[in-house]
Amino acid sequence: LEQDDNNEIRAFVLNGESIKSLEKLKCKIYYGDVTKKETLLPLFENIDDKEVFVIHCAAVVYIKTKYNPLVYNVNVNGTKNVVDKVIETKAKLIYISSVHAIPEKENNDLIEEITDFNPDEVHGLYAKTKAEAAKYVMNAVKNKNLNACIIHPSGIIGPYDYGNSHLTELVREVSNGKLFATVKGGYDFVDVRDVAAAIITASKKDNKGECYILSNRYITIKELSDLICDVQGIKKIKIVLPICLAKIIAPFFEVYY
């Protein structure tokens, strides 16, 4: 975005959060909280004569089983506040959702984009909040003339992860030789640079009401760990635990972390 001198880039940052990822970028920083609608006001000032695109990617990624009200407040209520402000200012919204907002199919069949979201059809707090938020976006598209599209990335992986996501932590643990075992199963991963490029492309298209899955291919955790070990020149992890055992011990790791 900053490669185009005509673009004015504004970043909305939660108070107290690190801005290390933005330090070398040509953008103006606004501090606030998506759950507090009034803090969004300065972000949308002086835009009457501009074509405005809002990329909403603020969210709390949550994999624990215990209910956390912050997840709902940010992922759902925060999205509602952003949507309402975008409607008011007649901007275009690119909402960054997740593949978890889409119901899984039986036998791990391939999922496809949907436009009708139902939190009751997905599992886990994070998935339910992303589905409910996506539902709000699509309802606003249909009933309030919101110009928006939805992006559904799979597991985002790649460089410049200043927030140390779960996947980045996994890569570091393997790289440092701290994991003695992996688990069966895997995931569909997507490079963060491809996600960024897709978001920019989506902002330029006439795609009101469209949804896009961003993914690559299924990779087992063992395959990923082997690749990391090859790059690092260290011994590969030989122990692979069944997923049922991983589910049993997961609550203990939740307490630990």
What are the residue ranges of the model-derived segments?
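Mid/C-terminal beta-alpha module of Rossmann-like enzyme folds, strongest
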Residues: 198-257
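Glycine/proline-rich active-site loop of Rossmann-fold NAD(P)-dependent oxidoreductases
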Residues: 144-146, 158-169, 202-212, 234-236
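Conserved Rossmann-fold NAD(P)-dependent oxidoreductase catalytic core, especially the SDR/UDP-sugar
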Residues: 53, 77-126
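A conserved pocket-lining segment of Rossmann-fold NAD(P)-dependent short-chain dehydrogenase/reductase
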Residues: 119-120, 169-190, 194
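Active-site Tyr-X1-5-Lys
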Residues: 121-149
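Conserved catalytic-site region of short-chain dehydrogenase/reductase
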Residues: 63, 99-109, 156-162
